Amino acid sequence: MGRSVYVVVWVCLALLVSGCRRSADVSTEEQPFLVNLDLNVALSDIAVPRSRVSSDAAPANDDEKMQTLRIIVVRPDGTVEANRFVKPSVALVYDRQERFKVVGREKKQVYLFVNEGNTVVETMDGTPVSAGGKLSEYLTAIGVGDSFPAGVLASLVIRLDGDSAQLSGALPMNESHEIEVGATDCSFELFVTRAAVKFTYRITNQSERNLVLTGLTIDRMARREYYLPHGTVYADNEDGIREIVQYDAVPADYYTFVYADDAISDAGIALPHGKTVELPAIYLLEGKSAEPYATSLAINGIEQRKAFPSLPQLPRNTHVVVNVRIPRYGNGAVEWQVDVVPYDEVSLEPGFGV
């Protein structure tokens, strides 16, 4: 009798231990495998060797830098794993390391949004993304565990109304990256791209008299662009500088941008002889015009035009630098030089008089 009792007790203990082990195994399988994910974010033209970037490629002011940054990490099933908003004390070109605790052994999509508070977007049919049209309200409402609205974000556009409208304040920047997180802690260097085309005009008056700029236009500019890069492919050129080699543009009407400035509206912008005048930067939208881009300047009321045959496309983050020289002698015709940075620091048509 005593022996039977001991046998029963040992059997019960064995079953209990076995059950606990199975329970522990199941619990271990259900627990996600977590690792540290460190992300560093830089402007696309800063994330290259600095010796290869000209001064025109560097950010000119705080509007061209990161004033706020949002990082959203999305798992393979489309679930939001993290949504973090960062507001540094000063505008940055390179963000400090941001660490996330995430599930390992899987690919993830990382969405980066910069300067969202100054960005107004809408859907393709013109519907505002939020009550006030502000992107920040929409992004803030995306919670961890929610299904990420990739389709909605891919359809958002920025629009400029009016022939003199341009992007102002902190420029919109963004990007999405696919990363593969392994079984150990890992880090990635990511970049964001400015969703704008920048024009810089420098006018050098080498004539013997003071002149006045009374007008400036840029032909074939797009009224709308995708907020996020759309169908965009990047490649490093021979100088190691990242450039956009393929992208989609919003099918939209093109128009002639008319530069509006209080000085031009009144008496024009003074062009003193022997001096170089640089106009405030102009920020417009990317496009894919089937016709050549062109610009015109009116000096003392006389218009002069220049086509850009070597500038077939204007992807985002392009910086077009237009140098204009008014020669000392001649029939009054100006000479033009056009450079594009940071993607291509070589003059499209080297030298003046082209």
Positions of the model-derived regions?
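Bacterial N-terminal signal peptides that target proteins for export
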Residues: 1-9
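C-terminal motif of bacterial Sec signal peptides marking the signal peptidase cleavage site
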Residues: 16-19
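Bacterial lipoprotein signal-peptidase II cleavage site
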Residues: 21-27
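Compositionally biased, non-globular sequence tracts
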Residues: 30-32
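Short, low-hydrophobicity acidic/polar segments
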Residues: 34-38, 42-199, 204
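Tryptophan-paired
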Residues: 58-131, 200-202, 207-316, 350-354
